[in-house]
Amino acid sequence: TTGRGTYVPLVFAPGEAFQFDWSEDWANIGGERAKLQVAHIKLSHSRAFLVRAYPLQTHEMLFEAHWHAFRVFGGVPGRGIYDNMKTAVDRVGRGKQRDVNARFKAMASHYVFEPEFCNPAAGWEKGQVEKNVQDARNRMWQVMPVFADLDELNQWLEDRCIALWAETPHKALPGSIADVWEAEKPTLMALPPAFDGFIEHSKRVS
């Protein structure tokens, strides 16, 4: 932040970070209008992104969204930038202090990335993905999508996202988002098997 309160753009190295956010949108699924929770995951350097739709914002949906994003991106960045969503943060403390949810922490450890949480009401800290929410509405939700089921919708969303990488100039770097992603891909960490959501609870036996 400068003295006059303007925000300096955040610059990210290849493989450094991704940003995550949820939005709500509507689709026609199996002949019925359904309100969906839409996960947006975006690589901060190349700006490659994935959008996936779910019925709820549960841990299971959150974990699946991460797995599919890392699969499509071809690996895992070093850190993830989030707001203080309830599936990730049990309690927001002072400054950057957070009580991180045990299941969320287990997922981050499994994929070996460092979670980082924005200050409350500081959406600019993950401004790329918040812009992505608006762009996705303009590009994919101008007309309500109509699909037989969520699997069909999510396959269409994945294909559309990847097509948009090639169609969209990166702007900060030469070439398209797809061009910059191809250069970023070798810097991502190898993708392990999907996280199963299981965590151990130790109990004392009297």
Q: What do these predicted ranges mean?
A:
Residues 82-83, 94-95, 113-137, 153, ...:
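RNase H-like two-metal-ion nuclease catalytic core shared by retroviral integrases
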Residues 2-49, 58-63, 109, 197, ...:
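Mobile-element integrase/transposase regions
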Residues 1-27, 92-94, 99-100, 174-187:
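Basic, flexible linker segments flanking DNA-binding modules
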Residues 133-206:
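Active-site-proximal acidic segments at structured loop/helix or strand boundaries
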Residues 96-115:
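Two-metal-ion acidic nuclease core segments, chiefly of the RNase H-like superfamily
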Residues 52-79:
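Active-site beta-loop-alpha junctions of metal-dependent nucleic acid enzymes
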Residues 76-96:
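Acidic/histidine-rich, metal-coordinating catalytic segments
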